């Protein structure tokens, strides 16, 4: 009945493309019955740098496939806002904050789409999406080309082996240059890429596109470009189209053995040969097809949808593994998931995102094997808990459709399930399986937060509790020295958004403190230790002795803390080794210089001693802590600071002022680019020096400059900066540095 009501209301709303709507409803019904074969399913994400047009593109996709009745613009200029930006803050700011999931039909294929944020502060949303998707569309701006966050998204897609198409958007913008964007795709991202279609005209003269494989031009008619018309290639563009097609064949031949043989034998590939070769190379991630268009002007979206079906993999063409954790084994073995869409195999699914909805906690799940039915009992591999599926839904932004069953390859959501992001759910008879976890970056910035009204403390703790469950990059702790609640995240915007959500969703206005950088402390060289913890107070006492080395890790592992047990024999019984490790990790929570965490170190336990009566777990915890403190007293300790990769775009006349500003902030310029009266500056700048840069850049470029930044690495800070940080810490904790007191006297 619910589906019939949805169908009748959607039919009343929908005006253009009635046949498409009918197809959607019939197909949605077949999806919920689980009979759509794998070959007709695509799980894709749309990712890019901020303001490349991802959400606008998704809006067009939903309109052309009959999923929505009318289109709206991203910033809510028409008072509505994009369907996929369902959060009020998203419509107000014109940015995507959370990943939004939807599904639609195109040419009898079911496409699950996740629209992801472009802002680096919300990078965990992109990580989650790519982990569970089979393919992706990387959107590039025809003016900006490959930008800061594009590089990050490319790295994330490589981490999860996600094949992707590239869509060069915004060809209608002044200064659009798709050739430069393609060149940057090859040089900056090291991708084997080539045009699959090219534009007819640019900027205000964009009339259509040329399909290089089918060798025809495509024109988009109608008020919203919904009518696609095919014509011959215009005579003035035949030469360029032939050259670009030859370039496409050569690039694919380098990546595909079958087409490579045809190329060497000088045989002309047919349209089907070329499409099959492009698909094989794309699925292997050895080639990326490049499509062009303008989502805002409704051009090039339908060919992109065709390319998603033709070139991106279905769930059977992607190998997904679960880890089988056998008892007594430190490392689990990998098990290949069976993506057959039936109930012959036991269910395995991954909870990749949590969201608090109107009806309770919503858990997004990707089904990797078997099927999940409403009322089924499933097991959480991490906690061992058994939970019942009370309600199973498919999502369209913030709207839902109830379904009875979800099969392998489907993305669905569950209600009322208590879990954390990254948990694996399994059927009862394979509860020791777990999917590979999602990579969670470390927070780089912290702020103190408190409610404006002291009576709202409960609301604050309730909101923070929910946000930390939803977002693994959002952390919170209570500072016992300053008696403040400290929240940590990926950037100022990240924490600012949560502060605003606290006010909107919990009626709890908050006051934020000044941003604090997440410094770290580390050693410069290895230091041996030999520490004995001994305590005797009548009766059984405490005794534990540890011998070993505290050594620094290489610069790539500055954020890690490692423990290595190299003991031989029973001087330290094996049951006490975890206690030594706990003591070591506890001691690393607070460094000796400025009280920040110690990282980039390895604790190597080589030997020790125990007492038959007095040795216990607490003894070796204290011994581990004491060993770290002893080693740090003898070591040279340095402060590590997060360094950001910054990309600045501004008019050429302000180049000198911008470079001077970067130098003042201890930045190191790594490269420069320029086109159409604008220059792009690439630099590595310490995060501690980036506060207030937005205001400075606007001031020195008359409001015409903009910048983006993302976390790059940790590195030792300059000696003068370290001295300044240590002095500030000593002043804040009530200790005056000896140097300053002498100077005052």
Swiss-Prot record:
InterPro entries: EFG_II, EFG_III, EFG_III/V, EFG_IV, EFG_V, EFG_V-like, EFTu-like_2, G_TR_CS. Its EC number is 3.6.5.-. Residues 1-30 form a transit peptide. GTP binds at residues 48-55, 115-119, 169-172. One of its GO terms (biological process) is mitochondrial translational elongation. Mitochondrial GTPase that catalyzes the GTP-dependent ribosomal translocation step during translation elongation. During this step, the ribosome changes from the pre-translocational (PRE) to the post-translocational (POST) state as the newly formed A-site-bound peptidyl-tRNA and P-site-bound deacylated tRNA move to the P and E sites, respectively. Catalyzes the coordinated movement of the two tRNA molecules, the mRNA and conformational changes in the ribosome. Does not mediate the disassembly of ribosomes from messenger RNA at the termination of mitochondrial protein biosynthesis. This is Elongation factor G, mitochondrial. It comes from Danio rerio. The gene is gfm1.
């Amino acid at each position: 009945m619910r589906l019939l009501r949805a169908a009748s209301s959607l039919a009343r709303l929908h005006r253009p493309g009635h046949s498409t709507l009918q197809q959607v409803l019939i197909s949605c019904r077949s999806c919920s019955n689980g009979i759509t074969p794998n070959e007709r399913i695509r799980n894709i994400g749309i990712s890019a740098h901020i303001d490349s047009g991802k959400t606008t593109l998704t809006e067009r996709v939903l309109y052309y496939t009959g999923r929505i009745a009318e289109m709206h613009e991203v910033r809510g200029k028409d008072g509505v806002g994009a369907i996929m930006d369902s959060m009020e803050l998203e419509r107000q700011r014109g940015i995507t904050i959370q990943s939004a999931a939807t599904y639609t039909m195109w040419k009898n294929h079911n496409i699950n789409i996740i629209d992801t944020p472009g802002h680096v502060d919300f990078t965990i949303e992109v990580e989650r999406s790519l982990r569970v998707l089979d393919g992706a569309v990387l959107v590039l701006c025809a003016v900006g080309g490959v930008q800061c966050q594009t590089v990050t998204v490319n790295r994330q897609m490589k981490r999860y082996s996600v094949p992707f198409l590239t869509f060069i958007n915004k060809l209608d913008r002044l200064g659009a240059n798709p050739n430069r964007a393609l060149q940057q795709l090859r040089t900056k991202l090291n991708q084997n890429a080539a045009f699959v279609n090219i534009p007819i005209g640019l900027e205000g003269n964009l009339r259509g596109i040329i399909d290089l494989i089918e060798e025809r031009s495509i024109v988009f008619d109608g008020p919203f470009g919904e009518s696609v018309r095919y014509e011959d290639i215009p005579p003035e563009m035949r030469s360029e189209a032939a050259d670009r097609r030859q370039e496409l064949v050569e690039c694919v031949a380098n990546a595909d053995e079958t087409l490579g043989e045809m190329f060497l034998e000088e045989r002309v590939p047919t349209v089907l040969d070329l499409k099959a070769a492009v698909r094989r190379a794309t699925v292997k991630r050895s080639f990326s097809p490049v499509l062009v268009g303008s989502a805002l002007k409704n051009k090039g979206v339908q060919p992109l949808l065709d390319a998603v079906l033709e070139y991106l993999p279905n769930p059977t063409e992607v190998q997904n593994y679960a880890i089988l954790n056998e008892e007594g084994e430190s490392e689990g073995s990998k098990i290949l998931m069976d993506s057959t869409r039936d109930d012959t195999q036991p269910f395995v699914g991954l909870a990749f995102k949590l969201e608090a909805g109107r009806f309770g906690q919503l858990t997004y799940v990707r089904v990797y094997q078997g099927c999940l039915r409403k009322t089924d009992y499933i097991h959480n591999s991490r906690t061992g808990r058994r939970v019942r599926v009370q309600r199973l839904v498919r999502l369209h932004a913030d709207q839902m459709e109830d379904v009875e069953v979800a099969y392998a390859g489907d993305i669905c959501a569950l209600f009322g399930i208590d879990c954390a992001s990254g948990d694996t759910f399994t059927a009862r008879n394979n509860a020791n399986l777990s999917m590979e976890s999602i990579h969670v970056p470390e927070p780089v910035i912290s702020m103190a937060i408190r409610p404006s009204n002291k009576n709202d403390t409960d609301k604050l703790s309730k909101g923070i509790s929910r946000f930390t469950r939803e977002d693994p990059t959002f952390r919170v702790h209570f500072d016992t020295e300053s008696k403040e609640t400290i929240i940590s995240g990926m950037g100022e915007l990240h924490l600012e958004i949560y502060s605003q959500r606290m006010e909107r969703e919990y009626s709890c206005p908050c006051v934020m403190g000044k941003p604090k950088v997440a410094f770290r402390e580390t050693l410069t060289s290895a230091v041996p230790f030999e520490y004995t913890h001994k305590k005797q107070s009548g009766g059984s006492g405490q005794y534990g002795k540890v011998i070993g080395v505290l050594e620094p890790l290489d610069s790539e592992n500055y954020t890690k803390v490692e423990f290595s047990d190299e003991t031989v024999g029973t001087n330290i019984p094996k049951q006490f080794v975890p206690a030594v490790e706990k003591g070591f990790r506890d001691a690393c929570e607070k460094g000796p210089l400025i009280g920040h965490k110690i990282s980039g170190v390895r604790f190597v336990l080589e030997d020790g001693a125990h007492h038959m009566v007095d040795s216990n777990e607490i003894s070796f915890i204290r011994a581990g802590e004491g060993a770290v403190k002893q080693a740090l007293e003898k070591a040279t300790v340095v402060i590590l600071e997060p360094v950001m990769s910054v990309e600045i775009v501004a008019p050429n006349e302000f180049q000198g002022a911008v470079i001077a500003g970067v130098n003042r902030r201890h930045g190191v310029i790594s490269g420069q680019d320029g086109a159409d009266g604008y220059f792009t500056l690439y630099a590595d700048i310490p995060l501690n020096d980036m506060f207030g840069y937005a205001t400075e850049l606007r001031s020195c470029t008359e409001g015409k400059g903009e910048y983006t930044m993302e976390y790059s690495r940790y590195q030792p800070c300059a000696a003068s900066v370290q001295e300044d940080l240590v002095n500030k810490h000593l002043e804040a904790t009530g200790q005056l540095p000896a140097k300053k007191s002498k100077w005052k006297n």
